[in-house]
Amino acid sequence: MLENRFHVKRSNFFDVLVVGGGHAGIESALIAQKLNKKVALITQDQSAVGRMSCNPSIGGLAKGQIVRELDVLGGSMAFFADKTGIQFKVLNKKKGRAVWSPRAQVDKRKYERAATQKVLGGGIKIVLGEAVSLKTEKYRVSGVILRDGSVVNSKAVILTCGTFLNGLIHIGQRKSQAGRMGEAPSEGITESLAALGFKTGRLKTGTPPRLNKDSINWSKTKKEPGDINPVPFSYFTQ
């Protein structure tokens, strides 16, 4: 399927251009493809499409319902979770059904592969590069400009950059520029949005510290097994 991957050296035109290959980017690209649109997904690293960060889980309190809503609306996250899950558990079972929340711990590498295969199998073009600016014509977005100066034209642009826009990582007292640990941030899109009159801000997400397993008294811990009869996320999972 590698014919779907290419380095842009000339102008290309798409109906929908998605910037970023995380959960939101994958869903956006696949839904647009289902609507028979010509779709391209821009990412700095094809192997990072669908990459899960520090906590490889899907769903949980409040979030599990959203995953199922995505499934009903034609999304793919629920299918990926069911296919790659290693532990399934419905939370809040001691309370009313309205607050029951499905959660799955998944194999993060298998999830990446499943997501990438789905994107490539759908005929979506993977554009390797870093989007640094929005291209506009007559007060409408008409594409993006990449770091190497290439232009990708489209009728619509969907930004799903996650934590990468001018991303910073704080570890103790140290601060460094990164979109994710070990990955470069995306610089330029934020400034492009600001130049178009959008207000920008900064959100924060936290990662809990890791413990050395040899420093833990395991006799004080309690196992939390998954459900004996796992409940899938997708209504289409048999």
Name what the model sees in each region.
Residues 19, 146, 159-160:
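Redox-cofactor binding/interface segments in oxidoreductases and associated redox assembly factors
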Residues 135-151:
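Conserved beta-strand-loop-beta-strand element in the redox core of flavoprotein oxidoreductases
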Residues 1-13:
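Intrinsic disorder/low-complexity segments
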Residues 13, 30-133, 156, 160-180, ...:
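Conserved N-terminal/central alpha/beta ligand/cofactor-binding core
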Residues 23-27, 112-113, 141-146:
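Short alpha-helical segments and helix-capping/turn motifs at coil-helix boundaries
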Residues 14, 147-156:
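Core beta-strand elements of the Rossmann-like FAD/NAD(P) dinucleotide-binding domain
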Residues 13-24:
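Beta1/beta-strand and adjacent pyrophosphate-binding region of the FAD-binding site
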Residues 18, 27-32:
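Conserved catalytic-core segments centered on acid/base and nucleophilic motifs
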